[in-house]
Amino acid sequence: MQDAAPRLTFTLRDEERLMMKIGVFVPIGNNGWLISTHAPQYMPTFELNKAIVQKAEHYHFDFALSMIKLRGFGGKTEFWDHNLESFTLMAGLAAVTSRIQIYATAATLTLPPAIVARMAATIDSISGGRFGVNLVTGWQKPEYEQMGIWPGDDYFSRRYDYLTEYVQVLRDLWGTGKSDFKGDFFTMNDCRVSPQPSVPMKVICAGQSDAGMAFSAQYADFNFCFGKGVNTPTAFAPTAARMKQAAEQTGRDVGSYVLFMVIADETDDAARAKWEHYKAGADEEALSWLTEQSQKDTRSGTDTNVRQMADPTSAVNINMGTLVGSYASVARMLDEVASVPGAEGVLLTFDDFLSGIETFGERIQPLMQCRAHLPALTQEVA
């Protein structure tokens, strides 16, 4: 493993920066985000995700997000071949939590916007106003070809035009309960949705291409991006700067939320040993599938999420930023994340979710300057 060269020093600039939000990226697919025969092997279940999100709520995580995946990568680990569905999972989790924000992901090629608008309004009712929607255009062609709904490869270059119309229909229906939108992709004829959400519905996205960031700048409440490298917590800063600049063009404030995997232990050496063990068990067959799919989109440029996911540097965990170290080291690196202009939060995954969240809440978070505002824990977690 190649760590960053000297550790960056930083100064948290103001009270706002001392309050970075933390979310958990729940394992809706088997084995979470480690494509390795040496990683924990498990199936996704409601009970597992309920335990994860209830622990996250106990430790004052701000939000939980689930992705949507409709076809996996295969290989020895059958990576992501087994997946729950995002909206129904998050509806269930909304009913068994009370404070944490809940986000489901809409694969927009599979669901008409009027149906998503109604499902979101329903989960808003279940959660008491704690629900939001992550919109994805879809990049893995076999997910949609298997159902006969892939619109053709021209979609790669038009997908944000499609998503722009999609979100306009959503905003109409959530805002007024009615839409007569007419576009290239959608035609609404006195379309109605009621009841409407009790609070303004948050829309999030994960654009890293120029087109994706332009969409987020115009329509999203915040934008997810990948962290980069191993123990290089501020390497994503140019991406956050691009998002900040794009948002300035629209006169909106759209912060970046950064995806990281945490692999922590008592010492740096113990954590590093875990990471090396996971890398040694990389499922090469599944990784080959990911690489193959990343090459299908020849029209969206070189800065898309899927291109980063398939980079061989750290493909074993789809090249999300990886923080490997002692509890104190991980806390320090997360504070460095908080120092980056435009970074408003992080979305965390763990090599082992249940023990990872507990360790984070008990051993890492109390050391973080950017979480010093949290109240003391007062109850037992289930």
Curated annotation (Swiss-Prot):
An example Gene Ontology biological process: nitrogen utilization
A GO term, aspect molecular function: uracil oxygenase activity
Gene3D superfamilies associated with the record: Luciferase-like domain (3.20.20.30)
Entry keyword annotation includes Transmembrane: no
InterPro entries per the UniProt record, alphabetical: Luciferase-like_dom (IPR011251), Luciferase-like_sf (IPR036661), Pyrimidine_monooxygenase_RutA (IPR019914), SsuD_RutA_monooxygenase (IPR050172)
Domain of life: Bacteria
Enzyme Commission code: 1.14.99.46
Record: residues binding FMN: I68, K69, N134, E143, R159, Y160, S209
Name this polypeptide is given: Pyrimidine monooxygenase RutA
Gene transcribed to yield this protein: rutA
